Structures are given as structure tokens and as C-alpha cells.
Amino acid sequence: MVEFTKRLLLERNFERTNRPITGPIVVHAVAGAGKSSVINTVSLTFQLICWTTLPEEKASFNCLHLRHLDGPAFPGAFVDEYQLADTDLSEAAFLFGDPLQYPGPAAQVPHFVKLFSHRCGLNSASLIRELGIAFEASKLDSVQHLDPYSSDPEGTILAFEPEVQAALASHSLDFLCLDEFRGKQWPVCTLYVSTKNLCDLDRPSVYVALTRHYERLLIMSFDAADTSA
């Protein structure tokens, strides 16, 4: 099973790093890279129970044999979002994670990594790289920066800043907060933020918000009309 998974990772264009393999094999992937697909393929092929540090209902993929990890990892276990674990993972076979999306104290140097997203497009990738994040894509997508006072939202509405959420709620606008949209995806999203300078915001939250769409993203910045900036 371990060799099968290693071959599968290489077939799915995960790159082997120069870290020697000792202990659990650590796999890092950006949002939309296909990490969940690898786990699901292994689970279905071997009828393997896979584990996640997240509550099962918040897991980023549907897996018939997915369970929440609430103790030390079992020998040979496959653990998703391992970096959030506060328990012993030394007996696991594979540790999967996206530390950019779920920062955690247990993050390790990976044995395999994939920086290419099949979900996001070129415009999104360029915006994400401005945050100092290595991120690649090849398909076309649309990213628009708009004035929230003169433009209407489309698709799923996202907001992670408390003051922005309060403003949207005051206008009876339905939106999803970070815990609700993390791990999910939609064709079109509208992201409301306090400033067009995304580098000034919490980087993990921005990263998650910028990687929820797979066709089109509208970014509504409340300082968009401020010409003094």
C-alpha cells in the first residue's frame, strides 16, 4: 500500500523532495492540487479507513471510510490535515496537509509536494503569489476587483473579517464565514474584504478565500473607492 501510494503521488505530479524517508511520509499540497483525490483513491482501492484531524462534517472531501482522529495515529494510518494534530502521529504511514490553509504547530518538512492547482486559474495564481505563496495553475479564470457600493455580488459570498461580516449582516446579505467556506468550492464566488491591499490581511484566511472558486472570483474591497490610497 505504501509503494502504491508513492507511485500514485508521482503519477499525479507530486514532486519528491530531498528529505530522506524516515517515519511517516509527509505530503503537502496547495488547494486544488488533488490531495483529497489521492487519499480517496487509496481508501477505495484498499478499503482503508482514513483519518482527519478535522470534524468529519468539515472534511474537505467525501470519503466512504473517513473518520475523525481523536487519539494517537494507528500503525499504517493515513492522516489528513495532520498539522493540526495534538497527538502522536509517529506510527502513521502517510501524513497529508496544506499548512497554508490549515496552519498548525505540527507541520513538518514534506517528502512530497505539489504547488500546482487544478481548481484555480492563472489570474488567481498570480494574485496568490503576490501574498508570497508559491502557487501554480494553467487554466484560464476570471478575477475582478470591484467597488462594493456600485456592484452586485455573484455566486457564493465569502467574508472572514469581523467588521466586514458585520457590515454585510447590517445589509441583510447572506455570506459564509471562514469555517463555513474552508474546504469547499463553487464556480463563482464574491469575496468582501476591508482593503484592496490583500497583503495587509491575515494570510491564511486570504489564501483560503482566494481558492474557493474554479471559474470566477469577484473581490469587493470597501476601500476600492478611496483614491487617496
From Swiss-Prot:
GO molecular function annotation: ATP binding; RNA binding
The keyword Transcription is assigned to this record: no
Its job: Transports viral genome to neighboring plant cells directly through plasmosdesmata, without any budding. The movement protein allows efficient cell to cell propagation, by bypassing the host cell wall barrier. Increases plasmodesma size exclusion limit. Acts as a suppressor of RNA-mediated gene silencing, also known as post-transcriptional gene silencing (PTGS), a mechanism of plant viral defense that limits the accumulation of viral RNAs.
Assembly behavior: Homodimer and homooligomer. Interacts with capsid protein. Interacts with host AGO1; this interaction targets the host protein for degradation, thereby suppressing the antiviral RNA silencing.
Cell compartment(s), UniProt: Host cytoplasm
Record-annotated (+)RNA virus helicase ATP-binding domain positions: 1-114
Anything else known: TGBp1, TGBp2 and TGBp3 seem to act together for cell-to-cell propagation. TGBp1 is the main movement protein that physically cross the plasmodesma with the viral genome. TGBp2 and TGBp3 would facilitate TGBp1 function.
InterPro entries named among the record's database cross-references: (+)RNA_virus_helicase_core_dom (IPR027351)
GO biological process, one term: symbiont-mediated suppression of host innate immune response
Gene Ontology annotations for the cellular component aspect, listed alphabetically: host cell cytoplasm
Domain (+)RNA virus helicase C-terminal: 115-229
Family assignment from sequence similarity: Belongs to the Tymovirales TGBp1 protein family.
Keyword Transport carried by entry: yes
Protein name as catalogued: Movement and silencing protein TGBp1
Key words, A-Z: Host cytoplasm, Host-virus interaction, Inhibition of host innate immune response by virus, RNA-binding, Suppressor of RNA silencing, Transport, Viral immunoevasion, Viral movement protein
